[in-house]
Amino acid sequence: MDRRDLLTGSFKGNDLNLGSSSDSLYAYAKLLGSSDSGMVHYCLEGTIFAYLPSGAIPLIGFRSILKHVWKSLDKETCRYDSYESGFFHGLNSPEPITEFNNPVTNEINILSEIRGGPYHKEISSDQINWERSGDDVWIQEPNTRKGHFGISRDDEKLEYAFANSIFRGKLSDLNDSSTTSPSVMTYNFVSPWYPFFQMENIEGKMYWQAVGTKIQSWSNVPHSIQKFLDQKNDNFFGSAKPWKKRTSTLQFYRDSLEK
């Protein structure tokens, strides 16, 4: 595939070669998002576990929408900004909750919202590592993070977290002339306790696990998420820039304490 094909996505058949820099970059953009500029969304459903010395205990469920705002491909890189909006829910219901009975501490916890972004990502072809089994292809994106996980960013204690996102699809879908393809996302995140769980004196970590799919329209969004986003009234789904100031679930919680 030549540069013109890369920029237009105009190729068909069995020509895609993931060992080629231009093909790999095109396939990456198409699998994760779009080979053209525009927005794509993932609906995520997951569970947070308390990972204790005695084993893992399910704490709470969560649902969110992950938004990628993709820029047009160039010869060297692909770029996008990401945002996330969502909520926590009980283990037996998909409806949002603002507090829950922590099964580890037997205390009532007041919860935050799930919110993140804008996060900017730029990736070149030499950073992309494909795995393939028959028609199945996937990419892993491990990420070690270092930061302050307590109730204040002024806490001198630096701790580590680890996230791994996996995007999986079909080579045959990447090989057509469309600008986007179906994708399944698996997300895993291990970190110190977030302060709203009030477990800073308990040995262990929290483990977030979620699975989601790339969706094509608002009608594909689960009703509980539609209702949540409508109540937020920030046009999250339709806007390419739903908010300006960078935040995270942890920072959003900290900011809420100051209001």
Feature locations, PLM:
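N-terminal secretory signal peptides and thylakoid transit peptides that target proteins
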Residues: 1-12
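A short, Trp-centered hydrophobic/proline-enriched beta-strand micro-motif
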Residues: 34-47
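Short, solvent-exposed loop/turn elements at domain surfaces
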Residues: 51
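Predominantly extracellular/secreted and cell-surface proteins with exposed
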Residues: 55-183
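Domain-length functional cores that host ligand/cofactor binding and catalytic or interaction surfaces
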Residues: 154, 159-163, 168, 172-208, ...
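Edge beta-strand at a domain terminus
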Residues: 190-259
